[in-house]
């Protein structure tokens, strides 16, 4: 997933972050349509309503995430975004373990914000918007998954999201006028759609339906650290010590919550 994000960051010089986000959404919708081929029932309003809201929530999460990435390092953005899953888990229980996890997450975010707040206020706010959208993604994704046709509904949801957010495609036009190869942009859109959206979100649907929250949380706990590693290797983004401690604190908060479930 975050390898795709690293590719997206390299595109920011040619295409706006919002345009890259739309390319990712549209690319994922196209790939999923070709592979999944939803049946007629998937397009009925009774199913399309929830699927569409889910797709739009996912699109909002991606757009806010990419806008934040344009202002903050990858590992930092992901760590801030993880407030969403932590909040969802904390809302479901009031144990001491949950309080400890929330405390660790707050400390982690405070450490990260202390590094970036002075110069990247908007980046922090956008990452927190992405966190709120991620919380919505988890709650809606669970409802979609338990209906038994999660991959089909994921596909139709992304089609709805790609259509509704299609005005963002206009932000790609300047890149084409500046001489960017259209076919290269299409290829990158498909690559982003597969690496960052179609595959990981389809796997989320399988996981949300088949495993418990504890195991899912353990897997999620690896992602802030993974994002920091990808940012370091692919983008040469070296985190400050305080920032690294904040990322580890957020990952630790998720592990603490996982141990109580």
Predicted segment positions?
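Hydrophobic transmembrane alpha-helices of multi-pass small-molecule transport proteins
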Residues: 83, 97-115, 132, 221, ...
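Cytoplasmic-side transmembrane-helix entry/capping segments in multi-pass membrane proteins
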Residues: 46-55, 91-107, 123-128, 148-158, ...
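Specific alpha-helical transmembrane segments that line the substrate/conduction pathway
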Residues: 19-27, 58, 65-96, 130, ...
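Helix-helix packing/entry segments at the starts of transmembrane helices
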Residues: 23, 78-80, 140-162, 197-233
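Glycine-/small-residue-enriched transmembrane alpha-helix faces in small-molecule transporters
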Residues: 1-22, 53-56, 60-64, 107-110, ...
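Juxtamembrane helix-entry segments on the extracytoplasmic side of multipass membrane proteins
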Residues: 14-22, 43-48, 114-136, 170-191, ...
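Transmembrane alpha-helices of multi-pass small-molecule transport proteins
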Residues: 14-60, 83-88, 133-137, 155-173, ...
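Membrane-interface interhelical linkers
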Residues: 29-53, 94-100, 118-119, 148, ...
């Amino acid at each position: 997933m975050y390898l795709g994000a690293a590719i997206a960051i390299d595109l920011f010089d040619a295409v706006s972050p919002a345009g890259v986000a739309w390319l990712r959404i549209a690319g994922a919708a196209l790939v999923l349509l070709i592979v999944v081929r939803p049946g007629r029932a998937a397009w009925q309003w009774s199913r399309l309503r929830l699927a569409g809201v889910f797709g739009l929530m996912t699109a909002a999460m991606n757009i806010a995430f990419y806008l934040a990435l344009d202002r903050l390092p990858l590992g930092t953005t992901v760590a801030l975004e993880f407030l969403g899953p932590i909040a969802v888990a904390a809302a479901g229980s009031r144990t001491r373990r949950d309080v400890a996890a929330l405390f660790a997450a707050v400390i982690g975010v405070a450490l990260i914000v202390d590094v970036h707040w002075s110069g990247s206020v908007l980046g922090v706010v956008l990452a927190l918007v992405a966190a709120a959208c991620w919380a919505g993604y988890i709650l809606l994704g669970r409802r979609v998954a338990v209906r038994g046709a999660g991959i089909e509904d994921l596909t139709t949801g992304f089609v709805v999201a790609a259509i509704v957010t299609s005005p963002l495609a206009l932000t790609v036009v300047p890149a084409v006028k500046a001489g960017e190869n259209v076919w290269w942009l299409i290829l990158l859109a498909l690559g982003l759609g597969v690496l960052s959206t179609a595959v990981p979100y389809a796997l989320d649907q399988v996981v949300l339906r088949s495993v418990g929250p504890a195991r899912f949380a353990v897997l999620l706990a690896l992602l802030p650290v993974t994002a920091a590693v990808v940012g370091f290797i692919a983008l040469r983004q070296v985190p400050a010590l305080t920032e690294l401690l904040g990322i580890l604190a957020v990952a630790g908060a998720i592990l603490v919550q996982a141990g109580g479930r």
